[in-house]
Amino acid sequence: MTKKIIENDVNVSSPLGVGGGGRVIGIMQPYVFPYIGYFQLIKAVDKFVVYDDVAFINKGWINRNNILVNGKASMFTIPLVGASQNRLIRDIEVDNLAAWSKKFLKTIEQSYKKAPFYKEGFEIIEQVFSLPVASIAELATAGLKETCKYLGIKTEIVESSTIYNNQDLKSQGRILDICLQEKANHYINPIGGMAIYDKQLFADSEILLNFIKAKPIQYKQFNKDEASFVPWLSIIDLLMFCSAEELNEHLDKFELV
């Protein structure tokens, strides 16, 4: 079957840009300062559900990502207490966040202090890591909300654990139930879910299912030539090198499949 591509200039508030004002939902596990594709999903929907009451993913992106250090991708990892795939994300606490964040903020300062939007970006990061949060889910959600506030993204962000009461359901059945509870008629999922989600299942409930695919983006880092550009880093990198206006332009560079 041929894939249908919907370019990002379509009105995503209405399925396929045709008529009506539908409600668009996105759902994703909480990641701390994730890459730009995560924020593209948030911006593309009316309501974004932080999927915090599902199993933790070991060696995933919930508590780690990459920033630019000396011209190369360098991974940061937030320490956790008792992280296990047998526990829910919302139940996993951060281990001594104050001490870790002090070192991390120093790394950010050393790595980005000459970036054009260092002041604005650093204030966001510092604000998030100073909040009195206990769990990695709370920390990640705070990061999403503060970044969206800075970028002027008005999408409503909620945690799945606070609303839906459907932990007896699994996989796409649970996602579908959230869409139904929200009376959504359009669900957008990250591109990585194409192999496990069934468009017909959603269509049977009169819900359009699309997958969001980020287009390649490039912006000026410290490097002077395009060949040394380091792509797909944490949103932290874009906050340092791009104005809010430019970053929003990059957020619109996607297609729906």
Indicate where each model-derived feature is located:
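N-terminal low-complexity segments that are often proline-rich with Ser/Thr-Pro
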Residues: 10-14
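Residues lining hydrophobic/aromatic ligand-binding pockets adjacent to catalytic sites
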Residues: 2-9, 22-257
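Glycine-biased, low-complexity coil/linker segments
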Residues: 16-21
